[in-house]
Regions:
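Extended, low-complexity cationic-aromatic segments
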Residues: 1-61, 167-171
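Acidic/histidine-rich, metal-coordinating catalytic segments
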Residues: 71-83
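Short, aromatic/basic amphipathic alpha-helical patches
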Residues: 85-95
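Short glycine-/polar-rich loops that comprise or flank the Walker A/P-loop
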Residues: 40, 71-72, 95-99
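Active-site proximal helix-loop segment of RNase H-like, two-metal nucleases, encompassing DDE(D)
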Residues: 43, 113-135, 146-148
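RNase H-like polynucleotidyl transferase catalytic core
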Residues: 16-24, 94-112, 128-130
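C-terminal domain-tail junction helix/linker
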Residues: 135-178
């Protein structure tokens, strides 16, 4: 969200954290579509006005244009409705090198790109002041450029057995609800 505070916050001083007003003026939103190459850490990102199947297909086309021919592209997705829309599935049928994998409900942490989103939020967006969507998108694009200048491969720090156990606990919890 492009947010502007109604008043400037007080700066940090020795022994006191900086402050920020609770109220703000909202100047609009943007959607960041991002694809993380886990092997080298590079991120392909596109800011778009909305998050519908049309924008998602445009982003898939950007991935298609940026990944060398002949490589299989594994796309990890949440269960957002736009990802399963018939036109998206038709696009997928026409692009057999793309393979979609959907994370279980409430398991977005299994998607490595979520780590990138968290880092972007912490380092660039949190406590930021953006007086327009254009300012917000410029900040996101600068961060993408910086991150891609010296990318780092994504490495899981949790042991695979812990990850699988967490997924199984989540599945059991969901199945017990029904």
């Amino acid at each position: 969200m492009a947010l502007d505070r109604t008043q400037p916050g007080l700066p940090m001083k020795k022994g006191r954290a900086g402050t920020m007003t609770h109220d703000y003026k909202r100047h609009g939103t943007t959607t960041l579509f991002a694809a993380l190459n886990v092997l080298d850490g590079s991120v392909l990102g596109r800011c778009m006005q909305r998050h519908r199947h049309q924008e998602f297909i445009r982003f898939l086309n950007a991935i298609e244009a940026n990944v060398p021919a002949g490589k299989i592209v594994h796309v990890i997705l949440d269960n957002y409705a736009a990802h399963k829309q018939p036109k998206v599935l038709a696009w997928l049928a026409r692009h057999p090198r793309f393979v979609f994998h959907f994370t279980p409900t409430s398991c977005s942490w299994l998607n490595a790109v979520e780590t990138f989103f968290a880092t972007l939020t912490k380092r660039r967006l949190k406590r930021g002041v953006f007086r327009s969507v254009v300012d917000l998108q410029a900040a996101i694009n600068r961060y993408l450029d910086e991150a891609n200048h010296d990318p780092k491969p994504f490495l899981w720090t949790a042991h695979p057995d812990k990850i699988i156990a967490a997924v199984n606990r989540g599945r059991q919890a969901l199945e017990s609800i029904h």
